[in-house]
């Protein structure tokens, strides 16, 4: 078994006709790895994503999960990761990230404030408040293998991915179906599933296969429902770390440098007390998302 990729949050090993994911305690925001490890994080991500893979698999949605090896390691089916997609090929990971948004938050809100996205683009006739529920889900696609994720229109997404419009529509339908399941499941434990991202492969018959990980406090945004109903947003995901770096001014400095093509500032470590809070959050969110004890 040899390591073939060291990602922002997990290491990937080649083990014959399967891959092994080893989840680390690393944490990243804004495509920057923070020089602070978060206790419990790797275990939380592995156990939570394993829960969801089993959950959707039992409900007929194909995915690459095989087994959990231990609490921080899982085995999955292997799909090709080509440098460039050949038209009509199969058995490869689509080089895109698929994002579904059910509420106004995160980078969508940033784009609305900046004017690059208009309220009408997301079905609204007014400028929304942060946290406002969308009239229908917003489905977005970004690049996956560029240095920073870039929002794509459908034509460029199809060109990069080798998908047909019909296959794109099938992926969208599958992901929205998963999100409906997630909303119902986490709603039992007082959570709102605000948004999330997923990765997809094409199987032998070019059918969609859910891959990588999803539904964790890393990929998805969760809020406390009782607080939301009272008019407050309580972040129960990695978003609390993003908000911390926004509050320090780091986010603005980073994106200013990116917009100017300047060297990016190093991201500073998390303070010790903040790292402890984040660790506790990942442990708690495993229980809140899955309904299972740590």
Swiss-Prot record:
E.C. no: 6.3.2.6
Pathway in which this enzyme or protein is active: Purine metabolism; IMP biosynthesis via de novo pathway; 5-amino-1-(5-phospho-D-ribosyl)imidazole-4-carboxamide from 5-amino-1-(5-phospho-D-ribosyl)imidazole-4-carboxylate: step 1/2
What's the short name of a Pfam family annotated to this entry? SAICAR_synt
- Could you give a single Gene Ontology term from the biological process aspect? 'de novo' IMP biosynthetic process
Look up the domain of life of the source: Archaea
| Gene Ontology CC, one term | cytoplasm
Indicate whether Translocase appears among the record's keywords: no
Q: What class of enzyme is it?
A: ligase
Reaction catalysed by this enzyme: 5-amino-1-(5-phospho-D-ribosyl)imidazole-4-carboxylate + L-aspartate + ATP = (2S)-2-[5-amino-1-(5-phospho-beta-D-ribosyl)imidazole-4-carboxamido]succinate + ADP + phosphate + 2 H(+)
One GO MF annotation is: phosphoribosylaminoimidazolesuccinocarboxamide synthase activity
Q: Which UniProt keywords apply?
A: ATP-binding, Ligase, Nucleotide-binding, Purine biosynthesis
Q: HAMAP family attached here?
A: SAICAR_synth
Q: PANTHER family of this UniProt entry? A: PHOSPHORIBOSYLAMINOIMIDAZOLE-SUCCINOCARBOXAMIDE SYNTHASE
Task: Read off the NCBIfam families from this record.
Answer: PRK13959.1-1 (NF010564), purC (TIGR00081)
Give the family per the record.
Belongs to the SAICAR synthetase family.
Name of this protein: Phosphoribosylaminoimidazole-succinocarboxamide synthase
